[in-house]
Structure formats: structure tokens, C-alpha cells
Amino acid sequence: MSPLGSAGVLAPHLTRSTSAEEQFEMKLKQGHRVFGVDMRIVNDDEEPQPHDGKTRGHLVVRGPWIISSYYNNHDANDKAFTKEGWFYTGDIATLDENNILQLVDRSKDVIKSGGEWISSIDLENEAVGIPGVVEAAVIGVAHEKWGERPVLILVPQDSDNPPSEDSVRDFLGTRIAKWWMPDLIVFKDEIPHGATGKILKAELREEFRDCLLYTSPSPRD
């Protein structure tokens, strides 16, 4: 069982009615809820989203062992709970028709661009496949029209001969939606990590805090 209260063991009816390949795909996900934990995904307006395995939303949970409030801290409660008392886990997720959970990003890392969500994790997973790249990180940076746009930060295998920006865009162009394409591609010698090896995106966001992207052609021209 995961800390979220989900289990990866498939129910008997699913093992009987699905192929081995489908079962493998299900087991790659975080699993279905366990007894005593309710899960749903909601949009920014706290509206429940469909369990279709595709629609992404904020994962919220409730149950007898789930925190119901912070003691004497109204500001924290307003941020951590929906109006109906569901607790925000801080994850972006999907739920399918069998109520199997899949985590796709952290709420603080997802990029909200023109009313649509871009998963930083999905974009990073594609970017690390670029020939000559050893590590990738994606953050959202302010944009004068779209609110946020993705910035792709790459660590090249050879810092003296990094991939060209055109080759990066050509590689990603066949693998991601057009509107997911990063507005800015930056090469760095290294990306900051914490003690556990996790990328410190807060440091990257601080580094690009004063960056403001514009729609091309730039209004500054």
C-alpha cells in the first residue's frame, strides 16, 4: 500500500476481464483506493472531473485517518482543503473507469498555460531521450499572454558541443503536443539537487524569477 492509501494489487474481476498487457499497464500506476480512503480529482474550481484515465486534476482525499483540519490555522485550512472538506495531496493525477490512480505531476510543478495544463514530468521524460542530453528539468516561467510557458533546462553530455536548439525542437516535435513545446531552451553544466537526488526546482524558479516571456514577435522589438 502506498502512503496515499492506494494498493497495486488488481481486483479479481480485472484479472479475469483484461489481457496481460492491460494488466501490466494498470500495475504501472499507483493503484486503486483502499477501504477507508475516498479519492477524487477536481479542477481549479473544485469541480469533480471524470474518471476516464485522461482528464487531469488535483488529487483530493478524505477518510477517517486523513487529516480534517489544521488546529487554529484558518489560512492553512483554506489552502489545504476544498469547501467540502477534501484534503489536497499536492498531486496532479488521473483516475480511470476502474478508479485506478495515476500520478502525473506535483501541483506546484504543473505549468498552467492559457487555461491548459502542461506536465513538467512528462516533458522531462521526453527530453532526457534527446541524443547528447544527460539530464533535463522543466519549469514554468511567466508569460505576458499565456500566464505561464515551459522553460526546458538541459545538461549536455559534452558541454563544449551541446545539441543544437533546432535538433532539440525536432526531437520533441514528434513526441509532444505543439503547445507543449518549450518557449525557451537553456543549457547548463549542472542542475541543482537535494540530498536525496531530487531536482531542486525551487532554486531553478528563483533563478528565472525575473524572466518574462513574450509572444513572438516580441513587443519589445
Range-by-range predicted roles:
Residues E46, K188-F208:
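Flexible lysine-rich "adenylation lid" loop at the C-terminal edge of ANL adenylation domains
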Residues S2-I100, S107-V110, L123-E124, I130:
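Conserved AMP-binding/adenylate-forming
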Residues R209-L213:
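Generic C-terminal helix-cap and adjacent flexible tail
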Residues V138, V186-F187:
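Hydrophobic/anchoring residues in structured secondary elements
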Residues Y214-D221:
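Conserved small/polar residues in nucleotide/adenosyl-binding loops
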Residues G63, S68-S69, D78, I92-W180, ...:
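AMP-binding/adenylate-forming catalytic core of the ANL superfamily
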